[in-house]
């Protein structure tokens, strides 16, 4: 009889929960991040950042502090921290920190300063990191999330609310905070129910067929979790055709698959998928999904995969190992697409901000492709760890991502 990882986890969680309001179960994505961090001798947090630039002197630290506290009261996941209860991984929801949360920095190199501050965030300040870096050219607002408590979709919700609370209405009644705690628990339980449902025989048969001939992984296999690694980045911009109705994701996924297919032994492309943006609940509700078509093109197989995208990553890994597939869970390339078309940069006191993507992020996977879709333009950023990924391979991936748009004549530079 098959017993899903999610089902087994929920039984263990029920034994330690005992009705405690502050203990929450972990979703499949949260389990993955928890496992990755537990295997890291340095116990490093995977940071999900958002950067917004405003004119110098515009932002008030006091108003930002009040807005941040309101956001923390409204979204309990941001007050959460990974923990264990009776040996079972959980998310423990804490109170809003007593001391100042927002950190203000004045520096000549604001890009470097905010990354250093995000990496060196005191544990007692919680999982939600807010930094205001100033110089004579700009105010740079940096928001960092422990990825275990917040996914990419949720960052947009948090930024919208932070800016709204900054403008006014920062008070959050206790009754509202309590209601949001119940709403978060309900969202997590519904997510886990979907993941359990997506871990049945049909879903596992589908993913087993997808990974049966997948490469074992070329770069992620030999990586030491304790090593800091390196980082090199390339950027390119693509002007999307105005008449196009398709979103760029399938094209990018096919390009990433094509790039790795040219390099023997690499693992399948992985991409992030999901979220509960429409529900208005902040948390980590995404999944890491593989794309490894057999025969058909990646776009066609992707449509078939959508029926099973709720199968947790750890369940797919277990199915691959049970079938003795060469691939056993290592990742070489992860694709993330950020859709800015639905969320333009915020406007404060009538002054529009501008999203920024400063270099300096720690590379968690050998290659990370981030595509930012903003109206008629696509910005592609390819980060790789040069200590394990050869420069020629990184260049080949960048070239493969350019090819569909070069052919169509839409490369902007």
State the predicted function of each range.
Residues 65-143, 150-153, 160, 164-167, ...:
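Acyl-thioester-dependent condensation/acyltransferase catalytic cores
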Residues 2-7, 11-32, 37-48, 260-314, ...:
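Acyl-thioester-dependent acyl-group transfer interface
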Residues 81-82, 162, 166-180, 210-219, ...:
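A short N-terminal helical cap/helix-turn-helix that marks the beginning
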Residues 71-83, 245-280:
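Hydrophobic "lid/gating" helix adjacent to the active-site nucleophile
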Residues 61-72, 115-118, 155, 159-160, ...:
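Short amphipathic alpha-helical segments
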Residues 45-50, 78-84, 120-132, 171-179, ...:
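Flexible, Gly/Pro-enriched loop and linker segments at secondary-structure and domain junctions
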Residues 1-39, 65-108, 124-126, 178-231:
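Short amphipathic alpha-helices and their capping loops
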